[in-house]
Amino acid sequence: GLIAMMDPPREESRLAVEECRRAGIRPIMITGDHKITAAAIAKRIGILKEESEACEGAVIEDMSDEELQDFVEGISVYARVSPEHKIRIVRAWQEKGNIVAMTGDGVNDAPALKQANIGVAMGVTGSEVAKDAAAMVLTDDNFATIVKAVENGRNLYQHIKNAIQFLLSGNFGAILVVLCASVAGLPVPFAPVHLLFINLLTDSLPAIALGVEPHSKAVMEQRPRPMSESILTKPYLLSIATEGVSIGVMTMAAFLIGYTSQNAALASTMAFGTLCMSLWAMGRIGAAEASPNGKQ
């Protein structure tokens, strides 16, 4: 007689792989199984495409590190690999300037998990050696959980940037107003109680709100950031400066309009009110951009 057995991939695996590709993440299969088996599973979940190939570990055995770096670009499935092969594949992608996350569950995966930028071990079926070598342990052994972690991380990073931009823009605008008034020999636009109110309420609460905005799926349509990229990029700083100058100009204009009546208290009140309303409007714009239905 004939007995056939099948261990099919999880239904959510294909969706997770597709989401990885949209996010600029390339999934690669490295397995000890036969090449035909590995290729069949990889095609089923979308890892192996027409533009990529499958190979066995023996193919890279005699390759130099430089040759391997060129070779890995066209390979999406590696079969019959040894622990040494896994390390070399991970290192080849790292030397090409990529962040590499490696998943594994066995003792033979431990060296590659340690070599990868992010080692991910299986929490249910994984060995203790693999868990010790990994930086992260999956409690449900589900690849989709890794994709969800990437989405959460990108959203958290975007929320932090939104909060920083809000705080720096508002404070930059207030500093410009005080500086311009001092240079022009005008009275100080803000009373101490105004500054206290701005720092405790007008700045803090909207910044906190921006930091806890609902997550957006739009972040998974973006390409990964370069490793060397600072959080304070030139476009980001330009945006902060533009918003700060706009706030400063509007606040200073309100102060000068009030000061034409020779009433310093009125001028200060108008400047304070304009600054608060500007910060409120900027917070609402930031919240709209960070919302699930807005742009990131």
Locations of the language-model features?
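Acidic, divalent-metal-coordinating active-site segment for phosphoryl/phosphodiester hydrolysis
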Residues: 14-16, 34-45, 84-89, 106-116
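Membrane-embedded transport module
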Residues: 49-101, 116, 121-294
